[in-house]
């Protein structure tokens, strides 16, 4: 029997945030990362920058053709408008843009917008439906609100820096500006929640207050409940996952692997794979509590086995045993990994400076309305005339 003809392909869906206009007044990381995320899913993001200097991120880290390559990621899908917000004319124009916007993103010190005549009360008189995201070091209220705060300080106050590094040593940085990015992601959640509320509950906007240290604190797991219930102050544990065993980094002849053998059945398979069935069969190691009590012995056994093998040999052996394990990737490893490419997590982006650069893809993956890179990062003021 002949099959019916295939149905024609469905037309592409509109972007999830198509029609949402965002005014981004933030700079560096926290505010702009939120704007970047909203822009990837279709929002029209208008970035207001100071004339002549622009966002300082344009000049951070490694520079190519006069601009940071980081800028090419952080500011894609945005339009740049040069305005001096310290001057009356710039403030007037900004208010006109905000009057027609859905979202305002800012990460100035509390009180800055108020000093420019752009308090929430004043802006909501202009635009009652405005969703206003305010990211700052300590929030818009409280005794610390006026203190200067960067992501690193938020990581310290939020409890993260105390847990990083080796026990008894200097607290170390995670390696990226995780405090700023966590604040941005919490802010993005707030924006999307407020937009939904506006749609289904009467059209009113609201203010979203995100403090850097609170965004970090919100992911500190059982830190406070353990202190409240037991008086336990969690300490740094190096590469290990404290209270869970075995879960650690182990040396190989050519690098490091992370092994998570902390499930009861996984632990037994792991011990068989490394030639230590005696540990896998030990009654007191059949559950996590017992394994934590002997974690140094277990880690030593795994490390002695892995240290005689390459990373790939370890991964092959543990993969065959169905034990979760992974190589510690460098940028080179990521750039050469076929899985990243298969999931469109490495994309080539043409810049306005005449060269192409590989950039991270878009997260999360939406089946019906996936994110896209519609435009490359703008030069300072590229869109001033068109927008105004």
Give residue ranges: language-model regions:
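A glycine-rich dinucleotide-binding beta-alpha-beta segment and adjacent secondary-structure elements
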Residues: 320-374
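Aromatic-enriched alpha-helical interface/lid elements that frame and gate functional surfaces
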Residues: 245-321, 325
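Short Gly/Pro-enriched turn/cap motifs at secondary-structure boundaries
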Residues: 71, 237-242, 247-248, 354-357, ...
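Conserved Rossmann-fold dehydrogenase catalytic segment
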Residues: 140, 168-177, 199-216, 235-242, ...
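N-terminal helix-loop segment corresponding to the beta1-alpha1 unit
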Residues: 1-190, 194-201, 379, 383-386
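Oxidoreductase and adenylate-handling cofactor-binding alpha/beta cores
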Residues: 184-206, 218-229, 271-277
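Glycine-rich beta-alpha junction loops
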Residues: 52, 138-139, 212-217, 254-256, ...
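Flexible, small-/acidic-enriched active-site or ligand-binding loops
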Residues: 2-13, 286, 354-388
């Amino acid at each position: 029997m002949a099959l019916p003809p295939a149905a024609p392909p469905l037309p592409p869906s509109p972007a999830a945030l198509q029609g949402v206009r965002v005014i981004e007044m933030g700079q560096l990381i926290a505010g702009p990362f939120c704007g970047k995320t909203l822009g990837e899913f279709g929002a029209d993001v208008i970035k207001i920058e100071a004339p002549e200097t622009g966002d300082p991120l344009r000049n951070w880290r490694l520079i190519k053709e006069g601009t940071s390559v980081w800028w090419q990621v952080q500011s894609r899908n945005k339009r740049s408008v040069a305005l001096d917000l310290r001057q009356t004319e710039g403030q007037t124009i900004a208010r006109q843009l905000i009057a027609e916007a859905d979202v305002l993103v800012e990460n100035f010190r509390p009180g800055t917008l108020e000093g420019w005549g752009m308090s929430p009360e004043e802006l909501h008189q202009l635009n009652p439906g405005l969703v206003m995201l305010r990211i700052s070091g300590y929030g818009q209220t409280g005794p610390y609100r006026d203190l200067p705060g960067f992501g690193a300080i938020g990581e310290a106050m939020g409890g993260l820096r105390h847990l990083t590094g080796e026990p008894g040593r200097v607290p170390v940085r995670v390696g990226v500006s995780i405090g700023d990015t966590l604040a941005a992601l919490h802010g993005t959640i707030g924006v999307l929640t407020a937009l939904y509320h506006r749609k289904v509950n009467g059209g009113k906007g609201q203010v979203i207050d995100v403090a850097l240290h609170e965004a970090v604190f919100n992911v500190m797991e059982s830190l406070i409940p353990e202190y409240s219930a037991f008086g336990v102050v969690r300490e740094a544990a190096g590469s290990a996952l404290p209270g869970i065993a075995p879960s650690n980094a182990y040396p190989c002849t050519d690098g490091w692997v992370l092994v998570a053998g902390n499930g009861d059945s996984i632990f037994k398979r792991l011990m068989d794979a490394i030639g230590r069935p005696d540990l896998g069969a030990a009654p007191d190691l059949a559950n996590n509590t017992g394994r934590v009590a002997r974690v140094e012995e277990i880690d030593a056994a795994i490390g002695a086995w892995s240290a005689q093998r390459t990373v790939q040999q370890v991964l092959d052996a543990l993969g065959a045993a169905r034990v979760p394990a992974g190589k510690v990737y460098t940028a080179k490893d990521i750039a050469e990994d076929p899985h990243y490419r298969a999931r469109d997590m490495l994309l080539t982006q043409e810049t306005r400076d005449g060269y192409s650069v590989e950039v991270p893809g878009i997260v999360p993956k939406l089946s019906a309305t996936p994110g896209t890179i519609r435009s490359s990062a703008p030069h300072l003021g590229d869109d001033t005339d068109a927008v105004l």
